[in-house]
Amino acid sequence: EVIFKKYSPLGELGEFAGVYAEVLGKVLTTPVLICDRDHVIAAAGLPKKEVLERRAAPALEEIMESRQSYILENPQSSPVYAVEGYDRPAVAVYPILAAGDVCGAVILSAGEDRRQPSEADRKLIAAAAMFLGRQMEE
């Protein structure tokens, strides 16, 4: 019996992405998720089995396809749920771009306090997405 698994270039960085997510989660004290185009491949700041391998929600796919970041500007606006079956909304999403192609996203999830991301939070998430994209190009 042969089982085919969809190839994910970002999946090759799985262990590396996991360490990066862990460090970001500790610095930001907020849950951080890293996804390839289809699934969560790394998480920190929450029980990993709660989110690993879960599918990217249509809202996340739209953000990635737009190649634009998403920032929760107004806590009263309707929330964006980035991962199917995960009940915390995203407060910041930055697509991971490698050689002009979208290969995933770094997601800052709402913490217990559901605060808006600070400017420093945004820059750290953006740096993570850019760094992972650059690693993909190597």
Annotate the PLM regions.
Residues 85-97:
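A short beta-strand signature within small-molecule sensing/ligand-binding domains used
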Residues 96-106:
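Short hydrophobic/glycine-rich mini-motifs in sensory/regulatory modules
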